[in-house]
Amino acid sequence: MYDGKPIQIHSGEMHYSRVPAPYWHHRLKMMKAMGLNAVATYVFWNFHETAPGKWDWTTDNHNLKGFLKAASDEGMMVILRPGPYACGEWEFGGYPWWLQKVKGMEIRTYNKPFLDSCRVYINQLAAQVKDFQVTNGGPIVMVQAENEFGSYVDQRKDIPLEAHRKYSAAIRQMLLDGGFNIPMFTSDGSWLFKGGTIEGALPTANGEDNVDNLKKTVNQYHGGVGPYMVAEFYPGWLDHWNEPFQKVSADRVAKQTKKYLDAGVSFNFYMAHGGTNFGFTSGANYTNARNIQPDITSYDYDAPISEAGWVTPKFDAVRSVIKQSVKYAVPAVPQRIPVITPIIKLQNTVGLFDIIESENPVESDTLLTFEDMNQGNGYMLYRRRFNQPISGMMHVPGIADFATVYVNGEKVGELNRLTGKDSLQVSVPFNSTLDILVENLGRINYGARINSNLKGITEPITINDNEITGNWQIYGVPMDKMPVMPKMRSPYVKGQPTLYFGTFELDKVGDTFLDMEKWGKGIVFVNGVNLGRYWKVGPQQTLYLPGCYLHKGQNTVVVFEQLNDEKQTELVGVDTPVLDRLVKE
């Protein structure tokens, strides 16, 4: 019911954290033109608590109030999904990485240190959004408690069901205490309602295409009545590095949409518009077979609205079905944002090892993790000097997640948690240096392994089964800001990690897609914005560069290339993204 009248919610998911703030109105207009009347969004805790006790609710796309106002301006209802656990293919499922450092803390369970931290977050959030609730004349009509908790209950049978329920009830109570006074809901696969439902919250189903089963299951756990909603209806799917790009047919999505419309079932497309995992925000899955499955930078999701905000055949198919069903007017489709194709010359290079020489390392007898070093993301360089020669098989069982190995600055190989490669042959001469540059590819965001999320080298290194201890020098390389070009310059050294610097002039701005297919692995900054990771293995071969991050006149680019097997001289912007090209090595 809305203002005393029955309403069917036709919602689409779009995460404000994955879309540049200047594009929020455009994307919301696109969703309205698709026939939707609501937008759902996660709130990712770690997106707003950027360091312990430091909160950002105002800058750029951190401005949640600004997003809620934009939704209200566009006449869209809002479904808020604040977690505290979100999943969403986002780094650590939205949890701040430093929770792992708190003594006695166990995440996602009835644990006092964890609940105390959750309460601080929820109170911070409530202060930002409670005036935007529909009860106060705002656009927020529903709020979710936790997320897919039934899956976690099913995976963590070592915890008694009553303990799980005690935790989820505590989260609901925190939301109430914080001032949320609108309908609350949970979302789970319908077969997982037993562990996921919370008294006082509407159970909604994820991925449920059988309307009769939806109604039967909701009735079972909600006093024999609805309303009925599919909180995550998947028109596409998530994507991992080194795996094929996932696609779902437009016809299948349109037919399922019509089923929901005809049955009076409310639904939320997850995703209607996916956006981008800018910076180091992408998460990862875990399987026993693949160990870790890091998500690509693009969160296109094969959604009806593409990563760059374009109409797709799926958009047209859904729009057509909804227009035939609803009584309200569906507006015209907004114009596409212009595209440019710049050629960016890279004028200068400097080697990472040259920069490191001026830094002060942490000295340690044992290997330290990112968390030990108080670093959340980016890279870590482990260095050790050997006074005696040593050769043999080097075993690094705790590699998290990708590493390049060097002896006296020469690359000798790679280690890769994705492929299970944790060993390689090394030969370190007398009085020589071993370097291991480790990259965090994103913390696991789903499943029981979310509790095992340390990064760096997490177990001892051995060479010929002998543990290598003592005299480690450890350098943090967070890359949390765009590097400033130093006065020094370095000649190209094949295989060494290198920073490429360039400036370029524009007489007009627009979106573009940086072609990274000739590069190896790394990240790209433009005008201070980390566009995210690229990796030659694919399937993603281009990086989305929104035009709102560019300026008329001079622009600055920095590329951190980890593998550096070929010297690069330019970056090329192309007019079409490439997200589905795997490269088998």
Protein language model features and the residues they cover:
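Carbohydrate-binding surfaces of carbohydrate-active enzymes
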Residues: 115-129, 136-144, 150-151, 155, ...
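Aromatic-lined ligand-binding clefts that engage carbohydrates, nucleic acids, or primary amines
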Residues: 391-406, 434, 504-527, 534-535, ...
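Short hydrophobic beta-strand segments in globular cytosolic domains
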Residues: 7, 412-413, 531-532
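Short beta-strands within extracellular/lumenal beta-sheet-rich domains
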Residues: 376-385, 495-507, 541-543
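N-terminal carbohydrate-binding accessory modules
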Residues: 1-38, 69, 509
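Aromatic- and acidic-residue-enriched carbohydrate-binding clefts of CAZyme catalytic domains
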Residues: 5, 42, 47-55, 60, ...
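Aromatic-lined substrate-binding rim segments of carbohydrate-active enzymes
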Residues: 24-91, 172-177
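Substrate-binding/catalytic cleft of secreted carbohydrate-active enzymes
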Residues: 80, 84-117, 125-268
